[in-house]
């Protein structure tokens, strides 16, 4: 019985990690895309970053930047698990090796998300460079990170 439980847990963990390749068929937000996987669109949350939320300044520009980078292109999805909304959390890489999260941070369209990518020093460096260059949302003198913006919106 114990071995059966361990095997089931191992299978579940294996299903959350892994890799697949497919075309990007949709961009739902700056940090959320849909990739065709086994003939069905799978919602993918780009790991390590957080883009402006719906209604937040630069939300549409971040979504457009993501679309320009990935829509219709073949990508490799390196899955890391699920986010709080049960969407697949993953690194997404274009066929030429370009990491989508890194490109969005470098362009100034999102924040490095230290809560979930604290060890990713490259994202931190890319964000610092985008800030210094006032690229994307860093042109705003007081950009508000999505996690702070959500807290502010929830206040009565």
Predicted regions and their residues:
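Small beta-barrel nucleic-acid-binding modules, primarily SNase/OB-fold domains
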Residues: 2-156
């Amino acid at each position: 019985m114990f071995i059966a439980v361990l095997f089931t847990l191992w299978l579940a963990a294996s299903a959350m990690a892994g890799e697949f390749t497919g075309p990007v068929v949709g961009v739902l937000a700056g940090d959320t895309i849909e990739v065709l996987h086994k003939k069905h669109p799978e919602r993918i949350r780009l790991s390590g970053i957080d883009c402006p939320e719906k209604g937040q300044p630069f939300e549409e520009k971040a979504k457009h930047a993501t679309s320009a980078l990935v829509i219709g292109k073949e990508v490799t999805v390196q899955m890391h698990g699920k986010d709080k909304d049960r969407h697949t959390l993953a690194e997404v890489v274009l066929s030429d090796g370009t990491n989508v999260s890194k490109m969005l941070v470098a362009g100034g369209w999102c924040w490095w998300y230290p809560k979930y990518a604290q060890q990713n020093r490259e994202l931190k460096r890319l964000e610092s460079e985008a800030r210094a260059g006032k690229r994307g949302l860093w042109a705003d003198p007081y950009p508000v990170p999505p996690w702070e913006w959500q807290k502010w919106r929830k206040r009565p």
